[in-house]
Each structure stands twice: as C-alpha cells, then as structure tokens.
C-alpha cells in the first residue's frame, strides 16, 4: 500500500493511530476527547465512518480486539475511564462497558493474545496495572498489579501466547501469560500470571534507561528462539531486551540514541522489523543483521 494521507477531522493533537485486523479501518485517539474511525483503501482513498464521544479528557490510546470477539474497540483517557465500544449495525458504535477502577489518567491499554481470551491490560498514573478478563456470563474479572511503577505506568504490552521457538500456535496446553510494562521510574518490568495473581518475572527490573520509559513492545516470536522486548524512552534511547530460556537473565542492547525523546516502538507481524517514532517527527524502521547489530532500513517520509 503506498503512503497515504488520512484526514481524520480531529480538532486537536492525535495521540494514537491503530489499524484494525484487516487493514480496512483506522481508529485515532485525540486530545479533542474523541475517537474517530476512518475507512481506508488500497487505492488511497479514506472515508470518515464514525466519531465516538464519551471521554471527558484527552484520549491517549485505542486498541482493536481480535475479530473473533466481534467488532470491539477499547480506549483509555486522562479522565480515568476505559471504554469498550461495540459496533452493532455497520458504523453504529455504542459503549458496551466502562471501567472506572482507576481514578487518574489511564495511559496505556493492550488486548491480550486472542488465545488467552478477551483480556485487556491497562496502565495508569496511580502506578497500578489492571487486567480485565471477560467471563462467559458477560461479566468481567479483574486482577491487579499494585504499584507496578510507583510514579506511574506509561505503557503495557503482552507477550505472545506461544513459547519462543514454537512454529505454530496450535492447541497449546499452557499458553504464555506475561506482560511487559514501562514507567516513570525509568524501568521496564516483566510480569507473569500464575495461580491467580501477577508476580514480577524479572529480577532486578530492567533499568538501562535514565528517564521515563515512553513505550514498551513485546515482539512476535513465531519460530524465533528468544523473547524480545523493545523499549523507548524520554532519554532518547531505544533498548532491545532479549532472553533465551525461562530462568535466564534479560540482556539489554542499545539500538540507538536518537538524542530526542522516543515516543513509540512497534514491531512488524513477523517480529523482525521495528518502527521507532521520535521527537523530531521521524519514523525509522530497523532490522537486526546477521551479526546481531541493528541497522536502519528505511525512513518513513511524513
């Protein structure tokens, strides 16, 4: 698909842009307190489909659920609300559920791999992470990581449901149930859910950054022999964290010092390309070479 400009119609800063599973629709979150859904096509055209209103503050992030759960979108905001939006008739969206467990800004949300069921992780400025999991009766169970990052959680990202090295995600008896998080304490942490509660799964915390961690992204690992997490920070650095087997230590390598805050890091579906957006309005794409060094493969022109 060639690069194309999308007119969203937002009246203030856009904080998040997420494409749906099929690549047909884009959801955007803005400081104008709204979410907009825009249809996109390979021919380069775009069409406004819906505006979702209900937040009372800037909307920081949006996240599409896997289509096996229907047409479902989550959003989080400075107002402390996490709203689940469900599409009934085409482009007719309603609020299916509103979570108000956090009384402060909710900064990041992420749906779990679909193999784990319908579960949403949320990180907030109160330092806590909440995970909401849908029950068969339509209700929701909540598990919490209290004071995950005491000064505030900035980002959450789920591990793939498959163990590193697996070539297929078929009939897993014991799927991986882990989260990575970043915070204002400059650390990245890994959490594992077992026996009904979340426990830290990295000792000590991953602490090569010297300022707020702005984003963490756990890489897809199908067929890859290791687990990989990318983190981007206010300190300008992107760090690639890797671990081989369970029980080993995470190792961090600086991909690059961008000399300006790094806002977002995002993996390709195959886990071999990493996109980085920085404070100079640049988006660069990186790939690991055979010798383990990271090299820039392209710049996405604005």
UniProtKB/Swiss-Prot annotation:
Q: Which SUPFAM superfamilies match?
A: WD40 repeat-like (SSF50978)
Q: Using the chain's own numbering, where are the disulfide bonds?
A: none
- Where in the cell? Golgi apparatus; Endoplasmic reticulum
Q: Where are the WD repeats?
A: 9-48, 54-95, 101-142, 148-201, 208-251, 257-296
This protein's name: Protein transport protein SEC13 homolog A
Q: Which PROSITE patterns does the record cross-reference, listed alphabetically?
A: WD_REPEATS_2, WD_REPEATS_REGION
What's a single GO CC term here? Golgi apparatus
- Which GO terms label this protein's molecular function in UniProt? structural molecule activity
Under InterPro entries, the record lists: G-protein_beta_WD-40_rep, Sec13/Seh1_fam, WD40/YVTN_repeat-like_dom_sf, WD40_repeat_dom_sf, WD40_rpt
- UniProt key word Endoplasmic reticulum: yes
What's this protein's family per the entry? Answer: Belongs to the WD repeat SEC13 family.
> What UniProt keywords apply to this chain's record, in alphabetical order?
Endoplasmic reticulum, ER-Golgi transport, Golgi apparatus, Protein transport, Repeat, Transport, WD repeat
Q: Which GO terms describe its biological process?
A: protein transport; vesicle-mediated transport
**Pfam families the record matches:** WD40 (PF00400)
Q: How does the record describe its quaternary structure?
A: Interacts with MAG5, SEC31A and SEC31B.
Q: What is its main location?
A: Golgi
> Coiled coil where?
none
Question: Carries keyword Protein transport?
Answer: yes
Q: Which function does this protein serve? A: Required for protein transport from the endoplasmic reticulum to the Golgi apparatus.
């Amino acid at each position: 698909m060639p690069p194309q400009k999308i007119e969203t119609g937002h009246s203030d800063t856009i904080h998040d842009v997420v494409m749906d599973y099929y690549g047909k629709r884009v959801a955007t979150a803005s400081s104008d307190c709204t979410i907009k859904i825009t249809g996109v096509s390979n021919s380069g055209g775009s069409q406004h489909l819906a505006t979702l209103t209900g937040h009372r503050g800037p909307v920081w992030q949006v996240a599409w659920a896997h289509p096996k759960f229907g047409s479902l979108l989550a959003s989080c905001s400075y107002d402390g609300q996490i709203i689940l939006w469900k599409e009934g008739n085409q482009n007719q969206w309603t609020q299916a559920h509103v979570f108000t467990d956090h009384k402060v800004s909710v900064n990041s949300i992420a749906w779990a791999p679909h193999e784990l069921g319908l579960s949403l992780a949320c990180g907030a400025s109160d330092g806590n992470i909440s995970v909401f999991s849908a029950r068969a009766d339509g209700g929701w169970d909540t598990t919490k990581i209290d004071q995950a990052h005491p000064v505030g959680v900035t980002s959450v990202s789920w591990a793939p449901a498959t163990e590193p090295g697996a070539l297929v995600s078929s009939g897993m008896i014991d799927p991986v149930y882990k989260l990575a998080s970043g915070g204002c304490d400059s650390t990245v942490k890994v959490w594992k859910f077992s026996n009904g509660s979340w426990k830290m799964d990295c000792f000590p915390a991953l602490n090569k950054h010297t300022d707020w961690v702005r984003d963490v992204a756990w890489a897809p690992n199908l067929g890859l022999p290791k687990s990989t997490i990318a983190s981007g920070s206010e300190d300008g650095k992107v760090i690639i964290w890797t671990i081989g087997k369970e029980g080993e230590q995470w190792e961090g390598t600086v991909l690059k010092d961008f000399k300006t805050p790094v806002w977002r890091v995002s993996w390709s579906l195959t886990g071999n390309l990493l996109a980085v957006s920085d404070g100079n309005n640049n988006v660069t794409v990186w790939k690991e070479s055979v010798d383990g060094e990271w090299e820039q493969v392209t710049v996405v022109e604005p």
